[in-house]
From Swiss-Prot:
Heterotrimer of A, B and C subunits. The active site is at K69, S144, S168. PROSITE patterns: AMIDASES. HAMAP family: GatA. It comes from Sulfurisphaera tokodaii (strain DSM 16993 / JCM 10545 / NBRC 100140 / 7) (Sulfolobus tokodaii). Allows the formation of correctly charged Gln-tRNA(Gln) through the transamidation of misacylated Glu-tRNA(Gln) in organisms which lack glutaminyl-tRNA synthetase. The reaction takes place in the presence of glutamine and ATP through an activated gamma-phospho-Glu-tRNA(Gln). Keywords: ATP-binding, Ligase, Nucleotide-binding, Protein biosynthesis. Its EC number is 6.3.5.7. One of its GO terms (molecular function) is ATP binding. InterPro entries: Amidase, Amidase_CS, Amidase_dom, AS_sf, GatA. This is Glutamyl-tRNA(Gln) amidotransferase subunit A. GO terms for cellular component: glutamyl-tRNA(Gln) amidotransferase complex.
Amino acid sequence: MIMKLVEDLLNKNLDIDEYVERTYERIEKIEKKIKAFITIRDKEEVKREVREKLKNPKGKLSGILIAIKDNISTKGIRTTCASRMLEDYVPPYDATVIEKLKQEGAVILGKTNMDEFAMGSTTETSYFGPTRNPWDLERTPGGSSGGSGAALAAGIVDIALGSDTGGSIRAPAAYNAVFGLKPSYGTVSRFGLVAYANSLEQIGPMAKNAEDLALLYSIISGDDPKDATTIHFEPQVPEKVELKDVKIAVLKDIVEASDKPVVSIFNSTLDKLSSEGAIIKEVNLGYAEYALPAYYIIAMSEASSNLARFDGVRYGYSKYSEGNWRETFAKNRGEGFGIEVKRRILLGSFILSAGYYEEFYIKALKIRRLIKDNVDNILKEFDLIASPTMPILPPKIGEVVEDPIKMYAMDLNTVIANLAGVPALSQPAGFYNNLPIGLQLMGRYLSDYYIMAISAKIEKVLNLYDLTAPIS
């Protein structure tokens, strides 16, 4: 638990040098095997900063090392988005969430690997190479925040930040047996996040237990004048919650589309919650078959607009400067972006072109509204919506990345929360042949603290928290 770790550091029950050395020894031992990081800061520099933070302790995270997904701007620390396009980019400013973490005494250990520009579900589209799952090195850690998930599972850090556009925090949380929250839309500033799809994405916390997840969320959340999409809200922290009489809706049409091993573990989890007094009932989401197409149409359309700025003139890879503008633009973007990013830019541009805008984009927005209305209606009757986080077990490296349809289908269970704007978290539900499987909980808008409080009860019932993969 982070609060205990801070206390031990402040009371000198844990030596600062020992804490930092232990972390870097772990990195030295396993980082080459898993490739969780793109950039790792100098050990002595980190040690000095930890000492400084503990000399003048001002916050809840005094001296604590944290891993940051590499699409979140960090002043003076390279931020690549796992792309050749931004291979050498060093931001001159911090994202709002980074400012908040620093104010609370956190120290950045490094920037984690991810799918290029957060476009992917396996952390295989990174220009710097794939991240491997610490539970099984032949498999992916999920994506796009796979580096953050792997760093947690491998025992390198206790807390991390990710971003979630259609499941990019929850997928790695599920596949790495850790906890991850996609916050209610607008509760965490996106200022300093390199945008993929503005109307869907949120920065969110990742941790090894529900308590640390809630602590990290409490620090990074809040309105921000630099981000017009943030809202002012009063945190609704429940004093006490119990599983008894909690009404949980199970999305039948989502569960039925999941693989048998996943459903088996999920049903076993539901049985345990039922024995604790939870009231569980199956419901149909409705429009489930349209959720993925609607999500990808919206996300790709927004991506094609957001990534237009990376032209090799104003931003990004600029190897070519001679010739006419069209030639240099095409060459720089052609070499600067990877295959998956180019695929999504092209599809997004096509969708937004004359004659197809109303046929695809407007229809996708209508489906989004229908799904949001259905989610809201279900949550008027129930306290929570539950489903497996991912429909399949962690795929092997190379198994889905070459097949876009297979990779996109992995997001079926998670995109619903992004389309509806509601909070959703993933926590460990169990293992099948030593492979982690996640439980997803969705709640009403702004019920983030409530679902994390329920998650804290569930982790104790399942006895699945503070897990570390047996990798050495």
